[in-house]
């Protein structure tokens, strides 16, 4: 789970047709400083459904995000730019990680908003699919967690992602009720472990 929300900071802006696909997508990322949305996701392996979940997310670039899964199991992931907390409610356990190590590789760069990430780590192409625009990112490294990422836009709004990992699993994410650049309270990206839970530092 904590590999997925990393990619959900990829958002929208206006298109400049003289730009390359990577530059167009990067401009979309740079246009978003804050974002909120509800999500639903399905993970498939060998054409079979492995898991299904839903919840809400928020991000503030650079480096802050909140990813809350509500169904089927409640989990909260909060990052403040330096540390990341993963709170598994049913286990009554909080795992604390260095944020960069917890995110890893390309995802951390996406979150931090480094402009060179797309062209450095991915080959990017785009195509029209009816009224939708699909950006297809193929990893240049076999070591990346996600070997392929598809970002699906309806006009200027990101409405879905497809993530292909090293194990052959496909994660299909749909976003709804998206708000771009809302004012977000700082406490949204702060976390204090509830009393009585186990805290594990990694």
From Swiss-Prot:
Gene Ontology cellular component annotations, sorted alphabetically: outer membrane-bounded periplasmic space
| One GO biological process term | lipoprotein transport
- Where in or outside the cell is it found? Periplasm
- Coiled coil (UniProt feature): none
Indicate the quaternary assembly. Monomer.
The entry's family comment says: Belongs to the LolA family.
Supply the name of the protein: Outer-membrane lipoprotein carrier protein
């Amino acid at each position: 789970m904590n590999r997925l929300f990393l990619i959900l900071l990829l958002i929208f802006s206006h298109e400049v047709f003289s730009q390359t696909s990577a530059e167009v997508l990067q401009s979309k990322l740079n246009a978003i400083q804050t974002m909120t949305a509800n999500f639903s996701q399905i993970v498939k392996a060998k054409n079979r459904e492995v898991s299904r979940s839903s919840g809400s997310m928020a991000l503030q670039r650079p480096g802050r995000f909140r990813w809350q899964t509500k169904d089927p199991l409640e989990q909260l992931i909060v990052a403040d730019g330096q540390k990341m907390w993963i709170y598994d409610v049913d286990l009554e356990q909080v795992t604390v990680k260095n944020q960069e190590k917890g995110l890893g590789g390309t995802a951390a760069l996406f979150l931090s908003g480094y402009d060179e990430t797309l062209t450095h780590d991915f080959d990017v192409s785009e195509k029209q699919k009816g009224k939708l625009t699909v950006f297809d990112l193929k990893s240049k490294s076999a070591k990346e967690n996600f070997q392929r990422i598809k970002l699906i836009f309806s006009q200027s709004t990101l409405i879905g992602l497809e993530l292909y990992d090293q194990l052959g699993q496909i994660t299909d994410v749909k976003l709804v009720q998206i708000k771009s650049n809302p004012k977000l309270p700082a406490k949204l990206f702060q976390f204090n472990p509830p009393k009585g839970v186990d805290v594990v530092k990694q």
